[in-house]
């Protein structure tokens, strides 16, 4: 492990992870049934259809590793059960429901709804990347556009998005011109996304970018360079002005309680009696696992 410095024999690691996964999946099924869960015909059909798609796409790899369609179907059905457990445990009628005010607080403090326009820090025709001076100029022009959005003072999300789109249309030709580029018909298209802290950490990797997003109030626009090749002209909006809490409940619960549920399932699975043959798993060297992508 590059962070902890710990080392492990690969075959031991594979055996351990295989057993933990099987134990956790068994715990998912046990918990689902204990809470009275039963998959609907539609859920089963959806899981089976996805399993067939996976088999169609990766069948050679699965077959080489001794995995058949029925195993994939069982796995996909367990994934449906796992998703359902989140609501069965933490939903409004769940075992330990999370109150609406807790969900709203998590939305406010740890999730970020943004309307944004992505600006490449390279010429899209020649793929010549901007140097530091060019990036600085592009960022300055984009921030001027963001300032105009803030000056417009839109009170609704619709107003804010309209102001963002208009500002982008006005600014993008000059921004693209820094790299001798030209805009396209969809350059000023506004996209919307609800980000978790994990999303922010993995996407806003440029120094200071994540904090720049976190510092924004609802309705506030900014230009943020998120990595070495992308600049966002964005406005942070109130998620509950875009969607209802019920519409967002599953996504918020997943971010808020997903890890807690997974930890509980892993712990429960480790305590379940089973007849898994750990010595048999240890006989499968990691080098015998077929990885088609490694051979392509």
What is each stretch, according to the model?
Residues 144-206:
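Peptidyl-prolyl cis-trans isomerase
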Residues 12, 16, 20, 25-33, ...:
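Solvent-exposed, polar/charged alpha-helical surfaces in well-ordered, non-transmembrane soluble domains
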Residues 43-46, 132, 138-151, 156, ...:
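Solvent-exposed loop/turn and edge beta-strand elements of beta-rich ligand-binding domains
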């Amino acid at each position: 492990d590059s962070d902890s410095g710990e080392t492990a024999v690969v075959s031991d690691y594979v055996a351990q992870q295989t057993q933990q996964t099987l134990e956790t999946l068994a715990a998912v099924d046990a918990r689902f049934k204990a809470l009275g869960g039963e998959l609907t015909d539609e859920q089963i059909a959806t899981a089976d259809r996805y399993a067939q798609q996976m088999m169609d796409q990766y069948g050679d790899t699965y077959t080489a590793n001794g995995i058949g369609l029925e195993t994939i179907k069982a796995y996909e059905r367990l994934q449906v059960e796992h998703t359902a457990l989140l609501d069965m445990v933490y939903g409004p009628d769940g075992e330990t429901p999370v109150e609406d005010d807790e969900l709203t607080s998590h939305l406010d403090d740890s999730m970020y709804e943004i309307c944004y326009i992505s600006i490449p820090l390279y010429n899209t025709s020649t793929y010549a990347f901007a140097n530091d001076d060019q990036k600085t100029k592009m960022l300055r022009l984009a921030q001027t556009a963001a300032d105009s959005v803030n000056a417009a003072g839109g009170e609704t999300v619709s107003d804010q998005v309209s102001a963002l789109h208009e500002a982008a249309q006005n600014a993008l030709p000059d921004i693209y011109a820094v790299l001798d580029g030209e805009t396209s018909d969809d350059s000023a298209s506004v996209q919307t996304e609800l980000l978790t802290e994990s999303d922010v950490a993995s996407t806003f990797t440029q120094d200071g970018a994540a904090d720049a997003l976190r510092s924004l109030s609802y309705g506030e626009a900014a230009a943020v360079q998120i990595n070495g090749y992308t600049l966002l002209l964005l406005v942070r909006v109130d998620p509950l002005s875009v969607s209802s809490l019920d519409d967002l409940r599953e996504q918020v619960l997943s971010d808020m309680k997903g890890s807690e549920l997974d930890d509980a399932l892993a712990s429960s699975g480790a305590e379940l009696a089973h007849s898994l043959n750990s010595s048999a798993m240890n006989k499968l060297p990691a080098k015998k696992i077929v990885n088609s992508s490694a051979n392509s």
